[in-house]
């Protein structure tokens, strides 16, 4: 049997979709369906529905839906073929899809995989043979606690300097050994090993194939680590060290320990923690994060020095709104996990992990107060709240209440920075900050829908229509410049609030057009200006219509001026807004033009 959908059907004849999904997440029956918290987004309301009758699942919040293989593939980060093989084995079904499985790589990628596989085998054999005669290597392995078992488990090898002799230089794929930096060509046309006299750690991708290496120098006087360059198959920001081996255990325990380096991950393995990976640095990329199922708790255990603490802070700040289960092992020792194991022993390391684990939000709070801000300083206090409030907004009400009470001691009302009834701070704040760019807050209270406000928004809308029209038609923009229409718009003279921002956008459009001398689009503007215009586009579908005639542009300019004059009249009773500083003579001329236009229309 080699048909994916046929094997899925056979599996569901032996069990139900809810039974299989229930092995991965907690589900509850309700009516004819089962319901669960959706693992594919930060779900709080059990939005995932599972129907055995239809053999389908569906989330009503994030709209992900599909059958058995879709769920398992997304949840386990496996291909359909991998899922089919796994479940077929579990239900004792005959399934062979080897040819399709090989198609995960194209021809060139497969050559890279083959080359790194050859190198990996050579390095492993070399290590085994060298430990009997190479005292420097033996001393290094002992000092790092790398036993025969550890070397075998993590496929650690050694480059004795003779690997360059293995590939046949006449063969076609020899160039792949060079491009992989396994072999380097000297100016004298001689070859040598890139990882010469180094202990080599293979780096596997999610499929378990070796895609690159990191070589550790035995001599401390040399560069400590040399890494494979990025290639067709090796992209460092898309790979987690040891993920291929750790993911099954991580999925079972719903936990994943995240370290900086190879030896830290190996140290945790030695004390029985097999669900650990290394990010190979101090940054966790979005691509790396996407490899890990969302229901798995991320437990960060980075180096204890200030650089390590800064790294944890930066990572948490980035991902705290993406994941609901994040913890940190607080490490105050200024050492990494590997050093702690060597110097303090396994029991100390286990106890540290057990006792010093804390929620990410607690770590962030303490980090801000100990490493960045002095809460007793008023300026620091404002900066602290601005930094901490968005992080706290992703938490539930219990956590928010805890910090509300804690910060009240410092006269900080954190609720003022969060949304009502536990809505997400970032969403409402993004909306409010955008609103503030458009409309200046009045200096005194006004009725919500006062005539003044209505007129103000009306001429702003007209002005935005002008800007979008100029962006939508290069011919109109040229007409606008040629006939000096800008000079006829009263609204352009003001310097208040959003009017000033829109005026600046118009000037940028004109400047871009003169410099570019080609079609000007909204994408040519700075991001902030694009955001303002797109906000209006979302508000009113009328903006999406282009002006087709030049006469419309003249009419629009007059409409803007008329609208502004109407608004100007409504302002006279208010002391909060100032009259625009217009030359008296110019005002008379402009008003005369408008009156003439009105009489023609009548």
Curated annotation (Swiss-Prot):
A zinc finger (CHC2-type) spans 38-62. PROSITE patterns: TOPRIM. Mg(2+) 2 binds at residues 303, 305. Keywords: DNA replication, DNA-binding, DNA-directed RNA polymerase, Magnesium, Metal-binding, Nucleotidyltransferase, Primosome, Transcription, Transferase, Zinc, Zinc-finger. It catalyses: ssDNA + n NTP = ssDNA/pppN(pN)n-1 hybrid + (n-1) diphosphate. Its cofactor is Zn(2+); Mg(2+). It comes from the Bacteria. GO terms for cellular component: cytoplasm; DNA-directed RNA polymerase complex; primosome complex. SUPFAM superfamilies: DNA primase core, Zinc beta-ribbon. InterPro entries: DNA_primase_core_N_sf, DNA_primase_DnaG, DNA_primase_Znf_CHC2, DnaG_bac, DNAG_N, DnaG_primase, TOPRIM_DnaG_bac, TOPRIM_dom. Its EC number is 2.7.7.101. GO terms for biological process: DNA replication, synthesis of primer. Residues 254-334 form the Toprim domain. GO terms for molecular function: DNA binding; DNA-directed RNA polymerase activity; zinc ion binding. Binds 1 zinc ion per monomer. Monomer. Interacts with DnaB. Contains an N-terminal zinc-binding domain, a central core domain that contains the primase activity, and a C-terminal DnaB-binding domain. PANTHER family: DNA PRIMASE. This is DNA primase. The lineage of its organism: Bacteria, Bacillati, Mycoplasmatota, Mycoplasmoidales, Metamycoplasmataceae. The gene is dnaG.
């Amino acid at each position: 049997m080699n048909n994916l959908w046929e094997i899925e059907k056979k599996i569901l004849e032996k069990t139900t979709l809810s039974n299989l999904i229930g092995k991965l997440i907690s589900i509850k029956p309700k009516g004819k369906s089962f319901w669960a918290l959706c693992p594919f987004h930060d779900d709080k309301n059990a939005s995932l529905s599972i129907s055995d009758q239809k053999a389908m699942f569906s989330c009503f919040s994030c709209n992900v839906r599909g059958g058995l293989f879709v769920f398992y593939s997304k949840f386990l980060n496996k291909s359909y073929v991998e899922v089919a093989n796994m479940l077929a084995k579990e239900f004792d079904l005959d399934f062979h899809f080897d040819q399709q499985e090989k198609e995960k790589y194209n021809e060139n990628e497969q050559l890279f995989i083959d080359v790194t596989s050859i190198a990996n085998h050579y390095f492993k054999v070399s290590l085994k043979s060298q430990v009997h005669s190479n005292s420097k290597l033996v001393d290094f392995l002992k000092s790092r606690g790398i036993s025969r078992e550890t070397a075998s488990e993590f496929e650690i090898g050694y480059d004795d300097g003779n690997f360059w002799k293995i590939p046949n230089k006449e063969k076609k794929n020899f160039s792949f050994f060079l491009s992989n930096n396994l072999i380097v060509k000297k100016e004298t046309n001689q070859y040598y090993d890139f990882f010469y006299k180094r202990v080599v750690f293979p780096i596997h991708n999610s499929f378990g194939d070796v895609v690159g290496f990191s070589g550790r120098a035995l001599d401390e006087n040399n560069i400590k680590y040399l890494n494979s360059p990025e290639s067709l198959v090796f992209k460092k920001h898309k790979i987690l060290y040891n993920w291929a081996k750790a993911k099954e255990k991580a999925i079972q325990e719903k936990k994943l320990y995240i370290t900086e380096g190879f030896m830290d991950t190996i140290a945790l393995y030695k004390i029985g923690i097999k669900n650990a990976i290394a990010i190979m640095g101090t940054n966790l990329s979005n691509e790396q994060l996407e490899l890990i199922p969302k229901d798995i708790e991320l437990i960060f255990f980075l180096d204890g020095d200030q650089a390590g603490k800064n790294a944890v802070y930066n990572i948490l700040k980035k991902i705290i709104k993406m994941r609901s289960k994040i913890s940190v092992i607080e490490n105050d020792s200024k050492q990494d996990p590997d050093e702690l194991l060597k110097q303090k022993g396994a029991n100390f390391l286990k106890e540290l992990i057990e006792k010093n684990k804390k929620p990410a939000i607690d770590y962030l709070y303490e980090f801000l107060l100990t490493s960045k801000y002095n809460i007793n300083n008023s300026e620091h206090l404002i900066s602290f709240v601005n930094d901490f409030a968005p992080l706290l907004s992703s938490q539930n009400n219990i956590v928010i209440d805890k910090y509300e009470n804690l910060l009240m001691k410092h006269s900080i009302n954190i609720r003022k920075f969060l949304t009502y009834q536990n809505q997400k701070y970032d969403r409402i704040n993004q909306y409010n900050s955008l609103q503030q760019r458009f409309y200046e807050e009045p200096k005194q209270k006004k009725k919500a829908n006062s005539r003044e406000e209505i007129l103000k928004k009306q001429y702003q809308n007209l002005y935005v229509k002008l800007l979008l029209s100029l962006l939508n038609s290069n011919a109109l923009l040229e007409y606008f410049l040629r006939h000096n229409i800008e000079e006829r718009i009263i609204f352009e003279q003001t310097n208040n609030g959003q009017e000033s921002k829109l005026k600046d956008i118009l000037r940028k459009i004109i400047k871009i057009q003169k410099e570019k001398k080609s079609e000007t689009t909204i994408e040519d503007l700075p991001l902030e200006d694009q955001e303002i215009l797109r906000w209006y586009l979302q508000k009113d579908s009328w903006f999406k219509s282009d002006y087709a005639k030049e006469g419309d542009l003249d009419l629009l300019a007059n409409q803007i001026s008329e609208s502004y004059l109407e608004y100007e009249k409504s302002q006279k009773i208010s002391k909060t807004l100032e009259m625009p500083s217009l030359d008296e003579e110019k005002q008379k001329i402009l008003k005369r033009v408008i009156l003439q236009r009105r009489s023609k229309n009548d």
